[in-house]
Amino acid sequence: MARFRGSITKVSRRLGIALAPKAEKYLERRPFPPGQHGQGRKGKVSEYALQLREKQKMKYLYGILEKQFRNYYKKAVSQRGVTGDNLVKLLERRFDNVVFRAGFAPSRSGARQLVTHGHLLINGKKVDIPSYIVSPSEVIEFRQRSKNMGAVTDSLNKAPESRIPSWIQVDKANQKAVFLSVPERVEVQEPFNEQLVVELYSK
């Protein structure tokens, strides 16, 4: 599947959020959009521009392109409940996102690589599809030959307990995680407004 190949730091500055760990230091130094006039840009932002920016935030944060993102939206609409909440829950249940949340990788892109390279199992079976939707009680662990990889061990050691969400139980010693439950929207602390995205697609 195609992935964004451009500069994640430039996109982070344009959207005003750190889309990856390496972008944080750039935002601290230059908290304004890139380009010759980035620092001096002012003026009223249109409703459409605000909606589009929130959609871009969500797409880049979770690392997905337009077609797949729109499919998530359609699925969210078809489910019971609040469409925006449903959309966030679907994105949080992506396999690569759960791997990232568990602390197995420092970024979602790193987590995606672990998944696509076949390092991980779900309930004892190899799953190499980043978009696989994880269900409550499913167990994620590394294949025997992939256990104790330096990058994974380093990521787990650096991941503070406070970063691991309550809906995922992590056994760092055995490099294993259990997806306990689907998170409620209020539990997901990400800098986007999904309701604006719903309004954009509803037009």
Curated annotation (Swiss-Prot):
- Keyword annotations of the record: Ribonucleoprotein, Ribosomal protein, RNA-binding, rRNA-binding
**Mind naming one GO cellular-component term on file for this protein?**
small ribosomal subunit
What's the gene? rpsD
- The S4 RNA-binding domain extends over 93-173
Q: What is this protein called?
A: Small ribosomal subunit protein uS4
Q: Which organism is it from?
A: Pelodictyon phaeoclathratiforme (strain DSM 5477 / BU-1)
What highest taxon heads this organism's lineage? Bacteria
Briefly, what is this protein's role? Answer: One of the primary rRNA binding proteins, it binds directly to 16S rRNA where it nucleates assembly of the body of the 30S subunit. With S5 and S12 plays an important role in translational accuracy.
Q: Which Gene3D superfamilies match?
A: Ribosomal Protein S4 Delta 41, Chain A, domain 1, RNA-binding S4 domain
Q: Where would one find coiled-coil regions in this protein?
A: none
Q: Give the family, as the similarity comment puts it.
A: Belongs to the universal ribosomal protein uS4 family.
